[in-house]
Structure formats: structure tokens, C-alpha cells
Amino acid sequence: MNDTVREPAGGLGVNHGPALSVVLAGGGTAGHVEPAMAVADALSVLEPNVRITALGTSRGLETRLVPARGYHLELITPVPLPRKPSGDLARLPPRVWRSVRETRAVLDLVDADVVIGFGGYVALPAYLAARGIPGLRRRIPVVIHEANARAGLANRVGLRTADRVLSAVPDSGLRGAEVVGVPVRAAITALDRMALRAEARAHFGFADDARVLLVFGGSQGAVSLNKAVSAAAAELAASGVSVLHAHGPKNVLELLAPRTPDQDDPPYVAVPYLDRMDLAYAAADLVICRSGAMTVAEVSAVGLPAIYVPLPIGNGEQRLNALPVVNAGGGMVVADADLTPALVAREVTGLLTDPPRLAAMTAAAAQVGHRDAAAQVAQAALDIARLAPSRRRAVGGRR
């Protein structure tokens, strides 16, 4: 896939002197791309001259998200990794090594000083390519970040030769990992919900003193959340609860009696997508959401109490992601099969009409949330890159 490779900022084959070159391997899903972009932003703050290259594939969200954030993207052949042993494992080696060769070309092209991997099918070839070949290719230092409570295949492989391993939670399955949380973009970590609350509620049409429930299921929404919450609309209105519901661009929300901000009843504001999550978080008192690693990280970072509804697929990672917050008292977990309109009405009304309990959950969520994870990952990578033997030899000349 070398025909997809574009010239990196700074030019090909130029002596960049002390400017560090960092490659971020975190393509595929938003759960891999967003932490990578948060770290990219932190790198740019800590080291303004840093050269950042994101590694991805043509199939992932990175083709849209990375350029939108102003970073350079290089593409390799995707190698989807099976969650469990299967016939796909037999075909994995030749497919992986093709991607490894392409990744080596990218690492050479940008003269990489360090690779930061976030797991997934882009990270595995990056880890393998960075190992080097004695006498033929220099080794490139690797920093791993694991966002999920249960480490995936790529990061388990990368662990064997990684220079530094960081994780979102304890007991991720990566030996020796330092717990730093999930890297979250600065627009969220710097959010002061109370300071922005009046503006946020006016933006969505809620009263200043409203009790607001936020509902979202990720970028594509979640059908089970949509059905359960929309069916509880009448009961929520009777309890004085306003709702901000992002149902997903591909979904249609069916409300028996839609309520808008210009009506007397508490409004039920339904939108396909929220492009200002900072305002959504600031407007809300409580959230119902999935518990992907990125979602839990953002919700806890801003100190929002949550009813987490783990996606009922995979190996149970989403439930594990939510447990640290839940165990601290900042939220609760409800199984997808148990999320009924009656449960929504009962739990939401109970929480939003009990200010002391809600305040305690808010404080607990904020206590668990990590606001400096992106800076910690970025600093770890910069420190290791500067200490690398190949980097020390390169100062003043080409490697």
C-alpha cells in the first residue's frame, strides 16, 4: 500500500537535527484513534517542534479523524486480529508481515524516534517493525498504552519488547503496566461543568434549574438504549426530568409524545449526533451510556454520575471498564438485557430527585477520573526517545 503514503511534514530525507519524530499506532475504532489524538495534542504542547505521524488503514475512522485534527496520516494494509483462536490465526503471519514491511517503510520515511501503540490491528505491525534486525535495522523504542480493562492481542504481543507500558486501569493483563488512565482530549479534561452550565443549558433549550439526563450510545448510537429511554419519556416528564438524547445518525427515535423546549413540559431533545460533547456534559446531571474505555474516561474525567450499560459482545471488556468508577461510587452498571423503560424511569428519577446522593456520586466520579493521562503518555514517549542510543548518535548527523 505504499502508493497511499504521503510525504511527511518536514520533507523526506532531511536532517531534522534534535526535532523528535513520533509515530502513533492507534487506528481502527474511535477507542484507538481518540486516545492517540489526545496524546498527539499533548506532544505538541510538551515539544512544539515534534514531528507527529499517525499510522492507520483505509478502513478505519482515522482517515477522517486524523486529518481533521491537523496531523499527518500514513496508511498500511489492515490485518484484523481475531478475538479468540480461529482459522484466521493460520492466515495471520503472511498478512501481518506484509503490513510489517509497509510499516518499516513508514518508520524509515519519517525517521521515527519512538512508536506509541494503542492496541488494535494497526499497532501489531508497528510493534514488530520497531524491533529492528541486528546488524541491518536499528531498533526503535516502543511505548504501549492499553485503554481497556482486558488487554488485546496486539498489546500482549507488544509487551514482550516494549520500553514502557501504561494502562487505564490496574490488572489489565499487561505485566508491569503503570496506571495513568485513558488519554482524553483537552477540551474535555479542561471542562468546568459548573462554569459552562448556564451556556450549555441555554444552547439545548433547558431551564437553568432543570434536572437533565444525557443519553448517548457512542458515535452510532445504541438501539437498546434508544428504545428503553424513549419509552420512559412520559414517566420522566412526570418527574420533571429533561432529556438530551443522541440516538445516532442511522437510528430513528420514536417518541409517543415528543416534547420541545417551547412546551411547558420538561423537553426531550433528540438529536442524531452531538458535535459539542463539552456542552452536553456541562448541561447534564446524569448520563446513561455504554462503557467503552473512551466513554468511561470522558464521563469520569468531567465528574458525571453515570448509569453504564455495557455492550453485550466481546469478552466482557465494557463491564470491566466501568467497574473502577462503579466501585468508587460514581456510577452503576445495568446489563443490556435488564435495561427496561421501568428501570430507566425508576433509577433516573430516584437519582435526580436525591441531590445529596447525586452530589456524592459526582464527587466519586471526579475522584476516579484521570485528567492528565495524555500528558503522562506523551512525556513517557519523549523521555524514552531522548534516551535511545540511536537518538544520541543522531544529534548533529543522520542515523
Curated annotation (Swiss-Prot):
Q: Which Gene3D superfamilies match?
A: Glycogen Phosphorylase B (3.40.50.2000)
Family annotation (Pfam families) = Glyco_tran_28_C (PF04101), Glyco_transf_28 (PF03033)
**Residues the record lists as binding UDP-N-acetyl-alpha-D-glucosamine:** T29, A30, G31, N148, R185, S219, Q318
* SS bond list: none
Protein's membrane topology: Peripheral membrane protein
Name the source's superkingdom.
Bacteria
Cite the annotated pathway. Cell wall biogenesis; peptidoglycan biosynthesis
GO terms in the biological process aspect are:
carbohydrate metabolic process; cell division; cell wall organization; lipid glycosylation; peptidoglycan biosynthetic process; regulation of cell shape
Catalytic activity, reaction form: di-trans,octa-cis-undecaprenyl diphospho-N-acetyl-alpha-D-muramoyl-L-alanyl-D-glutamyl-meso-2,6-diaminopimeloyl-D-alanyl-D-alanine + UDP-N-acetyl-alpha-D-glucosamine = di-trans,octa-cis-undecaprenyl diphospho-[N-acetyl-alpha-D-glucosaminyl-(1->4)]-N-acetyl-alpha-D-muramoyl-L-alanyl-D-glutamyl-meso-2,6-diaminopimeloyl-D-alanyl-D-alanine + UDP + H(+)
Function (record text): Cell wall formation. Catalyzes the transfer of a GlcNAc subunit on undecaprenyl-pyrophosphoryl-MurNAc-pentapeptide (lipid intermediate I) to form undecaprenyl-pyrophosphoryl-MurNAc-(pentapeptide)GlcNAc (lipid intermediate II).
Matching NCBIfam families: murG
Q: What's the protein here called? A: UDP-N-acetylglucosamine--N-acetylmuramyl-(pentapeptide) pyrophosphoryl-undecaprenol N-acetylglucosamine transferase
